[in-house]
Amino acid sequence: MNKFKNIAVYGGGSFGTSLASLAAQNCNNVTLFLRDEAIAKEILHNKTNVKYLGDIKLPAHLQATTNLDIIKDFELIIIALPSYAFDDSIKLLKTHSISKDNTLLIATKGFARNPTALFSDRLKTLLPYNPTAFFVGPNLAKELAKNLPASASIASLDIDIANKIAYNLSSKIFTTNVSSDIVTLQVAGALKNIFAIKSGIDLARKQGENARATLIVAALKEIAILSKALGGMQKNSDILLEGVVGDLVLTCYSLGSRNTKFGYELGISSDKQKFLQEYKELVEGREALKLVLDLIKKYNLHMPIISEVASCVIPYVMPAFAGMT
């Protein structure tokens, strides 16, 4: 199978940088594209991204730049940006003349917005001709950057594209599997962050490990409910992919997850309204929650865990949505 001659990673946060490090294990021409000139220079000269990954050393041949004009020259472009920036970032790529020859791997988790949609649906409008796949897995950024064992699922409607990407990213310590169910992988990647908030709240309430295991089972059922409503879950076995059950378990069980940490800190807070108003760190589950409620309402779905998390989070910051729970 052919290898990509070069790989771009668009997004210089913790996950984007760790994915660039992962890609560089198998490819000698990997460039990280980011907005912060100082971080780009740090990666080039020191091979670190201290702001996001501490003192973890990055591969010596990893390049970094803020110049998006050259991203069109890369065969594989990995998108690893926050969900709120997805639409604007894809539109920006279009202005930099990426062509149908550029393969896209979407590692962003969440939903497109205005209106709420899967990223795959938004790409049908913005970049309909590009080969596209989705990357979801139980991957803590710092562990990926340290080259510790991990796995992921690669999903694409074109299974040959999924296989090619998997071949380019796989190694003895990073294993992949492929799927054509792009809907379930996207839904799982978005919802797992919401369930992690619930896990953190339960941890703060000292609910115990039995409750957390029960949460995992109930969460998988809700992933299946929304996935089926959006056209996914053609095979029940899709729920067993690393990008579904593996990512869910990791995110819900690790305080290294920003979402679990957020839920825990919310749970122990004595003034929850003040906590929610003053919490500045990006929490993808909090962002996704505002959007998934649109889908629950649109398709008239019963998803009690999502509703419970909304009742804990949204009334304080978005009172108009409280009645939807």
Swiss-Prot record:
EC code: 1.1.1.94
Keyword Lipid biosynthesis among record annotations: yes
Pfam families assigned to the protein according to its UniProt record, in alphabetical order: NAD_Gly3P_dh_C, NAD_Gly3P_dh_N
Pathway terms, separated by semicolons: Membrane lipid metabolism; glycerophospholipid metabolism
GO biological process, one term: glycerol-3-phosphate catabolic process
Keyword terms: Cytoplasm, Lipid biosynthesis, Lipid metabolism, NAD, NADP, Nucleotide-binding, Oxidoreductase, Phospholipid biosynthesis, Phospholipid metabolism
Compartments (UniProt record): Cytoplasm
Enzyme active site: 192
Enzyme class, spelled out: oxidoreductase
GO MF annotations in UniProt: glycerol-3-phosphate dehydrogenase [NAD(P)+] activity; NAD binding
Presence of the UniProt keyword Oxidoreductase in the record: yes
Catalytic activity: sn-glycerol 3-phosphate + NAD(+) = dihydroxyacetone phosphate + NADH + H(+); sn-glycerol 3-phosphate + NADP(+) = dihydroxyacetone phosphate + NADPH + H(+)
Cellular component GO terms held in the UniProt record: cytosol
Residues that, per the record, bind sn-glycerol 3-phosphate: 109, 137, 192, 247, 257-259
Binding site for NADPH: 14-15, 35, 109, 141, 258, 282, 284
UniProt cross-references to InterPro entries, sorted A to Z: 6-PGluconate_DH-like_C_sf, 6PGD_dom2, G3P_DH_NAD-dep, G3P_DH_NAD-dep_C, G3P_DH_NAD-dep_N, NAD(P)-bd_dom_sf
Similarity comment: Belongs to the NAD-dependent glycerol-3-phosphate dehydrogenase family.
NCBIfam families cross-referenced by the UniProt entry: PRK00094.2-5
Function as written in the Swiss-Prot or TrEMBL entry: Catalyzes the reduction of the glycolytic intermediate dihydroxyacetone phosphate (DHAP) to sn-glycerol 3-phosphate (G3P), the key precursor for phospholipid synthesis.
Name under which the protein is recorded: Glycerol-3-phosphate dehydrogenase [NAD(P)+]
Species per Swiss-Prot/TrEMBL record: Rickettsia africae (strain ESF-5)
Gene that produces this protein: gpsA
